[in-house]
Amino acid sequence: MVYRPSDARTSSPLASVKTAYGRCGEESTFTVAALRAVGIPARQVYTPRWAHTDDNHAWVEAWADGHWYFFGACEPEPVLNLGWFHSPASRGMLMHPKVFGRYNGPEEIMLETPNYTEINVIDNYAPTAKAIVTVTDAEGKPVADAKVEFKIYNYAEFYTVATKYTDAEGKASLTAGKGDMLVWASRNGQFGYAKISFGKDDALQLALNRKEGEAYSLPMDLVPPVEGANIPEVTPEQRAENDRRMAQEDSIRNAYVATMMTEKQAKEWIDKLYGNTLQPEKKEKLVNFLVASRGNHQTLKDFLSPIRKEKDAVSWEEIRAIWILESLSAKDLRDVTLDVLNDHLLTNISDWEKIETDLFKRMYLNPPRIANEMLTPYKKVLREAIEKTVYQSVPDSMKRDPKVLIEWCRKEIKINNELNSQQIPISPMGVWKARVADEKSRDIFFVAAYRSMGWASAAWIDEVTGKVQILNEEFAKEDVNFDTAEAAQSRKGVLQATYTPIRSVEDPKYYSHFTLSKFKNGTFQLLNYDEGETDMGDGTTWRNLLKYGRELDEGYYMMVTGTRLASGAVLSNSTFFTIEPGKTTTVDLVMRESKDQVQVIGNFNSEATYRPVDSTEQRSILRTCGRGYFVVAVLGVGQEPTNHALRDIAALGNDFEQWGRKMVFLFPSEEQYKKFNADEFKGLPSIITYGIDVDDSIRKEIVQAMNLNNSILPVFIIADTFNRVVFVSQGYTIGLGEQLMKVVHGL
């Protein structure tokens, strides 16, 4: 399998095989399973968050000759203890694998559960230091059993990477890479926090002197560890042999991928099944589903074929089948099973005839997915079981009252969060049989049970807050409270944020530039305003979310903003405020700037492809440039702004040669390239690769991501393979070469 981003749910190893690609967590899960299957001890190593860039990563360690050796899962290098992440790992602050059962080795224990022990292996990858945190009350007395969270700034939030509890002397410790973290301590509703610099601060005293309701802002500068990778040597012979083996492995994978349905094959199959009875747009959707299902396409075909019974018409059952497929995520299409699809299709909605419009029929369809659980069949069996038990002795007038089901869950399901140590959701039928569950699995069970009853109503888990909600008879959302066995509308206010644009950020993005979190049990919990289908980083924007106001539950909140510099350092600002019912709260969204350091100003997908002028096949920017920084340009041949830019770069050709990183110069078309004469610009560095921007895709991506004019060339960016853009220029610019080199020197 090869790398491709996807959503946060991790595919099983066999599902990843059927897909032939996956994100790093799936690649490493697959590789660990494969090694263990042939008797080689292996474990997944995970850094919850990098400190120097907005991302995380997972890879593999394997045991050989008495030692653990790391490698890049499905991206193996010629030798062990080498991977593309080698340099980033040297800037890591925390890395941990899970060890089965109890563990008494030399590594620091991060978490101990009845099933596994989580250990800290950061010492194997980066220089480290230990720091001791002492938590006191407002009077300076040590506080025992205080919760201490060590947080890294990442994706515009302070993310908890380690949680400890203080001893009788109020102390807790952590060993980490030599960079900055935020330490957050809490107990009995009071909290306190401060920055700690590992390697500089060996001790920190932290008072619980903050409380809910205080309004203020706090700027903070955070510096990640410096890079210090010790890269093992790879001989040319080793590299050549590795390339040969990779090519062979690619051929095996590609032979399997060739068995998946192409768009043409899918279209032919759909046309044969439905003829002219199905609307073209619905046909197109089904074609897309079959192609997107990868190695799971036979499951979809087996789902659609048996319900095709009328040659001259499309039944409601078939329409519902299409709606079910539409409700699935891209990953669900790749691993959903036939029994799941049939269970959700064949379990009828009792009130189906009462629902007047297609819109509401789709609303009450109640799709298979609830949260990030493994999809299982449950509707038919669960509905029959609930009717015979929960509602058997209930008066007819109350058989559709959600309070009956809420009260049953409160009384009959025992909550034990410790038993589910890995927090993998228990299936709805598993909860029904055991009557014991963690809170998250209980929530999923309630939604599953509610949906199974076939009522003209809806239940779900809110994606932003994680609350269980239902739709009442007046089509209003109500929060389910299992403590009181009630469902009621929450009290809300409005948050509005003002923003004065800085040079590099016109419309701040959620997760890239800011986040919101709500106070609960002494700490703040992130609100998830997600967009897209990747595991992290795709969010909405200030303009769409907060410029005109956003309704939020009453309570105490924190807004975190951050400007990521090219060095990896962050200029953050945290604003604390309260949302009151029926009122509008206005805060400033502050993006801090640095006058001295290079800043991250946008994103560019380094996996984007182009066609080199000397090739007939497309190639990614990443493959051309390797890991690190690079320059990408889209040129306007013969245009004065482009000529100026090329001459400025040629004038500093030696400087760019010394820098040594790749530059990819693209032309809008083959015809444009044929008009280009490099001899007109003597001195252009040899590190330039020329190519064709196929379908104008790279230019469009840069223009959209950087909010540029759609028609002006040239466009230049400096970016890196963490997809960070640190420089952009468009159109006529004098001294472009000097500007580029100024940024290069600041990296």
Give residue spans per PLM region:
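A short, amphipathic beta-strand motif
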Residues: 129-140, 170, 493-506, 600
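Hydrophobic/aromatic-rich core segments of domains that either
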Residues: 4-15, 19-111, 183, 407, ...
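Secondary-structure boundary elements
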Residues: 1-19, 240, 249-434
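Short active-site neighborhood of thiol/selenol oxidoreductases, capturing the structured segment around
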Residues: 621-649, 662-666
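Short, ordered, surface-exposed loop/turn motifs in non-cytosolic proteins
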Residues: 138-157, 178-180, 401, 502-532
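Short, internal strand/loop/helix patches
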Residues: 679-713
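Short, acidic Ser/Thr/Gly-rich low-complexity loop/linker segments typical of extracellular
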Residues: 154-176, 522-546
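Structured interaction patches on ligand/partner-binding surfaces of diverse proteins
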Residues: 189-211, 564-592
